[in-house]
């Protein structure tokens, strides 16, 4: 099973409500469907990494990609609910930001859930009922601070990459910072940028 891809985006396309990219990786081109905000964030002829969920059927193989691991994992939770397929899962993530969606599921905010295309009241009720307990820990702290389940802005990662840091070490630094409660001098992107650079520089040989 494919769980992660890193490669150059060769082509971007929209077919109806589907946001598609062609990723060149190891001499192979992979068609991957993204949520709209991720599709807007990527550019052709640039290297990106995607967390992948693979769906295999008798006559088809589909890849769904996410820039953030937390969103890929939430997508997997969503499509485990009876009656919720991959397109409905993507619609939910398109309609709501990650934390807003988790909060809506935990608090049974049916109005928010029904904003997603193709999600009616009964499906929203079933989603909230089945996922509430599993996702409660994700919103245990609802303060303004970031927590490790919040997706980090792609532009922060991109900025660090332009400074010469590798993606894997950036994500490791972000995870370590989350475990430390975040930067000590603020919670804006500049604070996270400074803290990541300091942390990664201190671990250089």
Swiss-Prot record:
Domain notes: Has three domains with a flexible linker between the domains II and III and assumes an 'L' shape. Domain III is highly mobile and contacts RuvB.
Segments for region (Domain II): 68-146
Region (Flexible linker): 147-155
Domain I, as annotated region: 1-67
Pfam families in the cross-refs: HHH_5, RuvA_C, RuvA_N
GO molecular function: ATP binding; four-way junction DNA binding; four-way junction helicase activity
Subcellular location: Cytoplasm
Protein name: Holliday junction branch migration complex subunit RuvA
Organism: Parasynechococcus marenigrum (strain WH8102)
Role description: The RuvA-RuvB-RuvC complex processes Holliday junction (HJ) DNA during genetic recombination and DNA repair, while the RuvA-RuvB complex plays an important role in the rescue of blocked DNA replication forks via replication fork reversal (RFR). RuvA specifically binds to HJ cruciform DNA, conferring on it an open structure. The RuvB hexamer acts as an ATP-dependent pump, pulling dsDNA into and through the RuvAB complex. HJ branch migration allows RuvC to scan DNA until it finds its consensus sequence, where it cleaves and resolves the cruciform DNA.
Gene Ontology cellular component list: cytoplasm; Holliday junction helicase complex; Holliday junction resolvase complex
Signal peptide: none
GO biological process: DNA recombination; DNA repair
Keywords noted in UniProt: Cytoplasm, DNA damage, DNA recombination, DNA repair, DNA-binding
InterPro entries for this protein: DNA_helicase_Holl-junc_RuvA_I (IPR013849), Hlx-hairpin-Hlx_DNA-bd_motif (IPR003583), NA-bd_OB-fold (IPR012340), RuvA (IPR000085), RuvA_2-like (IPR010994), RuvA_C (IPR011114)
Family affiliation: Belongs to the RuvA family.
NCBIfam families for this protein: ruvA
Principal location listed in the UniProt entry: cytoplasm
Assembly and binders: Homotetramer. Forms an RuvA(8)-RuvB(12)-Holliday junction (HJ) complex. HJ DNA is sandwiched between 2 RuvA tetramers; dsDNA enters through RuvA and exits via RuvB. An RuvB hexamer assembles on each DNA strand where it exits the tetramer. Each RuvB hexamer is contacted by two RuvA subunits (via domain III) on 2 adjacent RuvB subunits; this complex drives branch migration. In the full resolvosome a probable DNA-RuvA(4)-RuvB(12)-RuvC(2) complex forms which resolves the HJ.
Region Domain III: start-end pairs: 155-205
